[in-house]
UniProtKB/Swiss-Prot annotation:
Biased composition (Polar residues): 197-207, 1513-1522, 1530-1540
UniProt subcellular location: Nucleus
Bias (Low complexity): 1541-1556
Any one biological process term the GO annotation gives: rhythmic process
Protein name per UniProt: Lysine-specific demethylase 5C
Per UniProt, location of the Glycyl lysine isopeptide (Lys-Gly) (interchain with G-Cter in SUMO2) cross-link in this chain: K205, K229, K244, K274, K295, K1127
EC number: 1.14.11.67
Origin superkingdom: Eukaryota
UniProt entry keywords in alphabetical sequence: Biological rhythms, Chromatin regulator, Dioxygenase, Iron, Isopeptide bond, Metal-binding, Nucleus, Oxidoreductase, Phosphoprotein, Repeat, Repressor, Transcription, Transcription regulation, Ubl conjugation, Zinc, Zinc-finger
Positions with biased composition (Acidic residues): 1485-1500
Annotated Fe cation binding sites: H514, D517, H602
Listed Basic residues bias regions: 1445-1460
Length: 1556
């Protein structure tokens, strides 16, 4: 059995060649070079150089083609034989009214063809039955042993195959009883292929492609049973008798005789039985016309259904019908109920007269044995491919091809392995069960559709790149017409041979086993797409392949002897290899060539969508194969594509245009052809044919000069007849022309026998011209006549070979090598002579040795050409030999004078030739020079050398020839270098070590290294470092012993220098500690004064504001500080960095700065007061309008005016104060109507630059500063600020202690006590508790507090009607009280007000918090009416802030509840209550408050706890860290002490940084 498809074994790979660019330039030359290797495989693959990538020149939009349809399992020869066999056996049963059903055995379709062949091979049916060898038959069919399969096969053979075989043999059929068996598997109904009718069948649509297009449909096994009683078998009755022996079909109870009506009555009605796809059976009785229409519908219906007809039995009671029929066997008409009518010839037979007899009247169509035999013996038609009806473009074909492949393999096309496609292809072509149909755009003419290569046809302009590829020899339009190609001598454009064909393939599309026309070469180039798989067989095995295929499929070759020339037959390579045929394979990828050699069978298939181009070409070595091909065609009677004789004669007519190799090959072929022509014409004369006439055969159409016997195209001669002018024969078939007399026949010839030798002679002259030239070259190279030729004569011979285009033979190569060698000798000799003339200035490395000079002279003497430079070389050799004698004498008398040795050495260098003695002289000179250099370097008077110099001397000494003096000097030098490197390493360790050494250690190392007579860089660096350390120590002593403590900048500079020194310094550790302490103090001071992320430095905050008088400068510099662009530490007081080191200068400058700051703020107040108020309805924008920190002009409600600079700002852009110290009054808190105690004081961020700590905190910093042994600019500025604050505090206390002010304070205290004593209701209203997350909830109270106050008329405001319930009731109460507020509470005389206002101004300029400041502020507030606009603005801002706090509180509550729901731990209620307070403000002030708490922790609680109220200034919110206690009980300001936290609402505007 043949190999299965699943175990397909790929054949070995064919040779693959990768030519270099030099080899690639000559296509036919390279192919001739690889031919000895590649020809043994039949095909080969060539990969061009990577840069050779021709553009695709096809016009894609206009390219349209109609492909061929290929059914894969009809391509393979053995599969087609099986299908033909099944079609014939199916026809056999069909004409007997049965349909072929192929049974299943062991779950696979029974191979009826193989079963039939094996039965024949085993001796036939009778012999197998006799010997009981059906088990052996099952074994040969690869069925497993046991299971009684042999008996099953016998039953199927008897039922299906044996009747057909008996009919084929012409013997009478014998009765074969069916053996009953129980078969569980179902038979498959066979649908005939009708292979001969393929060309007339409409192609299937590609949208019906399926991976497994099953041809075989299951059908139940017929059995003998009463059909009428069994409804299932009644359904099966529609299939007729089935593929059984006659008499074994289904038997119905109603057996009626069919008769023919001689008188021509109307045809009986027929029953059309249709099995629909749903499984229902429909029986219709129709008229003949309707029946014909139904048959037409069946032929065009696409539905998968089965239809057949059954004739109804004629009524046997009709006497006319009975008398009309007689049996053809017994010639009787009795028993007409058992008389059968043949549907083919209308003859009648008794069912019992047939052999074998039939038990009943069969249903359906029945034909007699004579008709069955005639139908089965009909010869099959030739097989070929049919054309598709759809026309494709490249895009539409590609879409179809890719879709088919992706659907078939169920994966993307580029991911399908080539091995899988190959195995699946051979499985499909070997499969009878599966029909897979593909399309192949093959043999598309490039002349009509355009080539894939650029072509110079003047139809369009080509780019330079396209022009290069259009003229390339590898362009398939150019290769067939190259000069070395034979086809260039054929004028006609032979499509497919001279003109390329195009191939557009899809997966599984195949090209079958074939050889090229006239056994020519072929070359195929894959332009793009997926690979193409090739199989090849060498020419030596071509006949073997043909024999194997004929042996395996004789049925095909019997009807079509030239089947392999039709390109329609495949055979599995494994099958061929198993029969000894050598097969190779390859995968041709895009951009690769595949070449097939003469008479090399090849086939293959495409892996997917691709585009290829192919053409034939013929070289000189093809001519013998072409002649043999004509003889082969003559035997097969196959038409020729062109006349081989005509081609030879046309090349012989112009021998000078032929390549020499081609001329020699043509001469050889021409000679054979002339000899054969002589023989044939002589045979013609012997037959008595003497008439002849000249005929220009090349002018006749090919079909008019073809031999009517062998179809060969005639050219040299042909035999014709006067009486039969329609035909002629070649001289090989002179007896097959006609039956006419020889006297009526005549010879038609192209050349006479005298002209042919003349043409042959011209070829010989052209071919032998090479021999004449070769003899001349041979004589010259071998000096056969004893005379050497000159170079000019040899060059002339080489030029002749080039001009006459002689082949690149071995002799020509010898001539070229001789010329090349002679010219090299001449050039070398001239260089030797010119080198002597150049003397010591010649190029180094060009000298030759004495031995080389002698060999060179011998080489020149041995060359077969004469050169006059030989005499010059001999003269140089004599000079060198004389010099050698002198040198030997000088070396023998050592020690000689150094001057003598040097002069001899220079003379030898002028010769241009190296003499062995010269090297010895050179060594002696080098030794003397090196020793002198060592002495000079180590001399005591010499300057110290470096380590590099010493190493260089050692390296140079290593190359000096050894001697006692040299060895001693080298040892001393090495010892000194070792010592020096050791000390250098010590110094390096000292410089690089992490643990620095003290100066004493370094001094010891330096002192010991002074005795080494070598310059040591690390020792020198160590000296410099030690000197710097001493200078640094001196600077430290100087600065520590000065009149004042050293400045921090100086100490930092010294520390930086000291750290860089590689010396261990005790003073450095002390300085680092002092600097660290100073930095710690400055950091602590910064945390005390500076806000978080402040744009000011500590020094700027501590010093008076230098820009207080200029609003624009102050604002612009503040913006620059916000952006980090402005730094002015050294410009604060107008002092330079050096002046800042003098304490006196700092104090003087600070005093001057105080005065300038005061003058500046007064000027700024006047300027800002002149600006229009944003609250005024008539305010208009002008150049003097106030601008907020956000960069916009504040306008309308929400604007606040700074109490210091009098400028206006948005309330939402700055930190604003709270009106009340606490939203829940207590018995000890201030009365609600004491509006002068409300915290309404506002300082803008430009005026309040720091946290403004309390004076007690500053004093603690000063105490720490006194302990520092370092001077800081910030420390001195802090001292000045403290003195300024204490001075102001003293003046403020003095003013508050005056008689007038004391009286005013007393009256204000009485008013406060009166308001405090206001009686409360007995049952104050209570309010629902606020949520735990409410940011307004404070303290531990559960209910809302009592709210009390006093209206102007003394009425109580604590009634429920006057108090708003719920959250925010304090703000609503304040809002309701605003219309009732009147003032002033005190009458403040101008004499008293003016000093207080001036003090208030100076106090606001201080960056320190003082209680006296707040006392003066409350007194001034009580002395004027309440600022209703500011109070309303503050109320609105606080309401907005509380609304945001409630939203945040609700979010926190929801988050806490989600945690509880998830099973997590809830948040601490106290923490939840306090959390909203900490997030009250999202601006920088909230972060500052948190930082103050951290500062308090870091300072260790230096200030008092935050239990006592502090002043109500805006800075108190910044000072919640509680660094110092409030002076609540000292001085007259105690009654006015309250806690007034600031309020900050985030501004929706962009910050100044973003605005800028």
């Amino acid at each position: 059995m043949e190999p299965g498809s699943d175990d397909f074994l790929p054949p070995p790979e064919c040779p693959v060649f990768e030519p270099s660019w030099a080899e690639f330039r000559d296509p036919l030359g390279y192919i001739a070079k690889i031919r000895p290797i590649a020809e043994k495989s039949g095909i080969c693959k060539i990969r061009p150089p990577a840069d050779w990538q021709p553009p695709f020149a096809v016009e894609v939009d206009n390219f349209r083609f109609t492909p061929r349809i290929q059914r894969l399992n009809e391509l393979e020869a053995q599969t087609r034989v099986k299908l033909n066999y099944l079609d014939q056996i199916a026809k056999f049963w069909e004409i007997q009214g049965s349909s072929l059903k192929i049974p299943n055995v062991e779950r696979r379709i029974l191979d009826l063809y193989s079963l039939s062949k094996i039965v024949v091979e085993e001796g036939g049916y009778e012999a197998i039955c006799k010997d009981r060898r059906w088990a052996r038959v099952a074994q040969r069919l690869n069925y497993p042993p046991g299971k009684n399969i042999g008996s099953l096969l016998r039953s199927h053979y008897e039922r299906i195959v044996y009747p057909y075989e008996m009919y084929q043999s012409g013997a009478n059929l014998v009765q074969c009883n069916t053996r009953p068996f129980d078969n569980e598997e179902k038979d498959k109904e066979y649908k005939p292929h009708s292979i001969p009718l393929r060309q007339s069948v409409q192609p299937s649509k590609f949208n019906s492609y399926g991976r497994r297009a099953k041809r075989l449909q299951p059908d139940p096994e017929p059995t003998e049973e009463d059909i009428e009683k069994n409804p299932e078998l009644k359904k099966l009755q529609i299939y007729g008798a089935g593929p059984k022996m006659m008499g074994l079909g289904l038997m119905a109870k109603d057996k009626t005789l069919r008769k023919k009506d001689k008188e021509g009555p109307e045809c009986p009605p027929t029953v059309v039985v249709k099995e629909e796809s749903g499984g229902d059976v429909k029986v219709e009785s129709t008229s003949p016309k309707t029946f014909l229409e139904s048959k037409e519908e069946l032929s065009h219906s696409p539905e998968p259904c089965t239809k057949m007809t059954m004739r109804l039995r004629r009524n046997h009671s009709n006497a006319q019908f009975i008398e009309s029929y007689v049996c053809r066997m017994c010639s009787r008409g009795d028993e007409d109920d058992k008389l059968l009518l043949c549907d083919g010839c209308d003859d009648n037979y008794h069912i019992f007269c047939l052999l074998p007899p039939l038990p009943e009247i069969p249903k359906g169509v029945w034909r007699c044995p004579k008709c069955v035999m005639a139908e089965c013996k009909r010869p099959p038609e030739a097989f070929g491919f049919e054309q598709a009806t759809r026309e494709y473009t490249l895009q539409s074909f590609g879409e179809m091809a890719d879709s088919f492949k992706a659907d078939y393999f169920n994966m993307p096309v580029h991911m399908v392995p080539t091995e899988l496609v190959e195995k699946e292809f051979w499985r499909l072509v070997n499969s009878i069960e599966e029909d897979v149909t593909v399309e192949y755009g093959a043999d598309i003419h490039s002349k009509e559709f355009g080539s894939g290569f650029p072509v110079s046809d003047n139809k369009r302009h080509l780019t330079p790149e396209e022009e290069e590829y259009a003229t390339s020899g590898w362009n398939l339009n150019v290769m067939p017409v190259l000069e070395q190609s034979v086809l260039c001598h054929i004028n006609a454009d032979i499509s497919g041979m001279k003109v390329p064909w195009l191939y557009v393939g899809m997966v599984f599309s195949a090209f079958c086993w074939h050889i090229e026309d006239h056994w020519s070469y072929s070359i195929n180039y894959l332009h793009w797409g997926e690979p193409k798989t090739w199989y090849g067989v060498p020419s030596l095995a071509a006949e073997h392949l043909e024999e194997v295929m004929k042996k395996l499929t004789p049925e095909l070759f019997d009807s079509q002897p030239d089947l392999l020339h039709q390109l329609v037959t495949l055979m599995n390579p494994n099958t061929l290899m198993s029969h000894g045929v050598p097969v190779v394979r390859t995968n041709q990828c895009a951009g690769e060539f595949v070449i097939t050699f003469p008479r090399a069978y090849h086939s293959g298939f495409n892996q997917g969508y691709n585009f290829a181009e192919a053409v034939n070409f013929c070289t000189a070595d093809w001519l013998p194969a072409g002649r043999q091909c004509i003889e082969h065609y003559r035997r097969l009677r196959r038409y020729c594509v062109f006349s081989h004789e005509e081609l030879i004669c046309k090349m012989a007519a112009c021998p000078e245009k032929l390549d020499l190799n081609l001329a020699a090959a043509v001469h050889k072929e021409m000679f054979i052809m002339v000899q054969e022509e002589r023989r044939l014409r002589k045979a013609l004369l012997e037959k008595g044919i003497t008439e002849a006439e000249r005929e220009a055969f090349e002018l006749l159409p090919d079909d008019e000069r073809q031999c009517i016997k062998c179809k060969t195209t005639c050219f040299l001669s042909a035999l014709a007849c006067y009486d039969c002018p329609d035909g002629l024969v070649c001289l090989s078939h002179i007896n097959d022309l006609c039956k006419c007399s020889s006297s009526r026949q005549y010879l038609r010839y192209r050349y006479t026998l005298d002209e042919l030798p003349a043409m042959l002679h011209k070829l010989k002259v052209r071919a032998e011209s090479f021999d004449t030239w070769a003899n001349k070259v041979r004589v010259a190279l071998e000096v056969e006549d004893g005379r050497k030729r000159s170079l000019e004569e040899l060059r002339a011979l080489e030029s002749e070979a080039r001009e006459r285009r002689f082949p690149n033979s071995e002799l020509l190569q010898r001539l070229k090598n001789c010329l090349s060698e002679a010219e090299a000798c001449v050039s070398r000799a001239l260089g030797l002579v010119s080198g002597q003339e150049a003397g010591p200035h010649r190029v180094a490395g060009l000298q030759m040795t004495l031995a080389e000079l002698r060999a060179f002279l011998d080489q020149m003497n041995n060359l077969p050409c004469a050169m006059h430079q030989i005499g010059d070389v001999k003269g140089i050799l004599e000079q060198v030999e004389g010099y050698q004698a002198e040198a030997r004498e000088a070396l023998a008398s050592l020690p000689s004078s150094p001057g003598l040795l040097q002069s001899l050495l220079e003379r030898g260098q002028q010769l241009g030739v190296e003499v062995p003695e010269a090297q010895q002289l050179q060594r002696q000179v080098e030794q003397a020079r090196w020793l002198d250099e060592v002495k000079r370097t180590l001399a005591p008077a010499a300057r110290r050398g470096t380590l590099a110099v010493m190493r260089g001397l050692l390296v140079a000494g290593a190359s000096v020839a050894p001697s006692p003096a040299v060895d001693k000097a080298r040892a001393e030098l090495q010892e000194l270098l070792t010592i020096a490197e050791r000390w250098e390493e010590k110094a390096h360790l000292c410089l690089e070590a992490r643990q620095k050494h003290p100066p004493a250690t370094l001094e010891a190392i330096i002192h010991e290294a002074e005795n080494i007579p070598v310059h040591l860089p690390n020792i020198q660096a160590l000296k410099e470092a030690l000197a710097k350390a001493r200078a640094w120590i001196a600077d430290v002593d100087e600065i520590q012993n000065g009149d004042h403590y050293p400045c921090l900048d100086d100490l930092e500079g010294l520390v930086a220098v000291g750290r860089d020194l590689p010396v261990g310094l005790e003073e450095l550790r002390q300085l680092e500690l002092q600097v660290l302490t100073a930095h710690s103090w400055r950091e602590k001071a910064s945390k005390t004064f500076l806000k978080k992320n402040s744009c000011y430095t500590l020094l700027e905050v501590l010093c008076p504001c230098a820009d207080a008088g200029s609003d624009s400068i102050k604002r612009s510099r503040w913006m620059e500080k916000e952006l980090g662009l402005y730094k002015s530490d050294t410009e604060l007081l107008g002092l330079s960095a050096q002046d800042l080191r003098d304490p006196g200068s700092v104090i003087v400058a600070f005093k001057e700065g105080e005065q300038k700051e005061k003058e500046g703020i007064l000027q700024l107040r006047r300027t800002n007061s002149a600006k229009p108020s944003p609250l005024a309805s008539s305010a208009t924008a002008s150049s003097a309008t106030s601008v907020c920190v956000c960069g916009q002009v504040p306008a309308g409600v929400g604007a606040l005016q700074c109490d210091l600079c009098q400028d206006w700002f948005h309330g939402r852009c700055v930190s604003v104060p709270r009106l009340l110290s606490s939203p829940r009054p207590s018995p000890t808190s201030s009365p609600l109507l004491a509006w002068w105690e409300w915290d309404t004081k506002f300082l803008c961020p430009l005026c309040m630059r720091s946290r403004r700590p309390r004076l007690e905190t500053i004093l603690a910093l000063l105490v720490a500063l006194q302990r520092l042994p370092v001077r800081l600019p910030e420390g001195e500025a802090l001292q000045c600020l403290t003195e300024r604050a204490i001075s102001w505090q003293g003046r403020a206390r003095q003013a508050l202690a005056s008689e007038d002010v004391t009286a005013l304070l007393g009256r204000l205290a009485e008013l406060r006590q009166r308001l405090q004593a206001e009686p409360r209701p007995e049952e104050p209203p209570t309010y629902p508790p606020a949520p735990a997350s409410d940011p307004l909830r404070e303290g531990s109270g559960k209910d809302m507090p009592k709210v009390q106050g006093l209206l102007e008329n003394g009425d109580s405001v604590t009634s429920p009607e006057k108090v708003a319930l719920g959250e925010g009731s304090d703000l609503e109460l304040l809002s309701s009280l605003l219309p009732q507020l009147t003032g002033p509470a005190l009458e403040l005389p101008e004499a008293t007000r003016a000093p207080l206002e001036e003090l208030m101004l100076e106090g606001d300029l201080l960056e320190v918090t003082l209680d006296e400041n707040h006392s003066i502020w409350q007194l001034l507030q009580a002395g004027q009416p309440p600022d209703m606009e500011r109070i309303r603005t503050l109320l609105e801002l606080e309401k907005a802030e509380r609304h945001g706090s409630r939203a945040r509180g609700r979010a926190l509550e929801r988050r806490r509840r989600r945690k509880v729901d998830r099973g997590g731990e809830g948040d601490d209620p106290a923490r939840e209550e306090l959390e909203p307070k900490r997030v009250r403000s999202s601006g920088p002030e909230a972060e500052e408050a948190q930082e103050e708490e951290e500062l308090e922790e870091e300072t260790g609680g230096e200030g008092p706890p935050q239990t006592l109220p502090t002043t109500g200034s805006p800075s108190t919110q910044e000072n919640q860290n509680g660094l110092e206690p409030a002076l609540a009980t000292s001085g007259p300001s105690a009654p006015f002490s309250t806690l007034s936290p600031q309020l900050h609402v985030p501004c929706p505007q962009q910050p100044p940084q973003q605005q800028l």
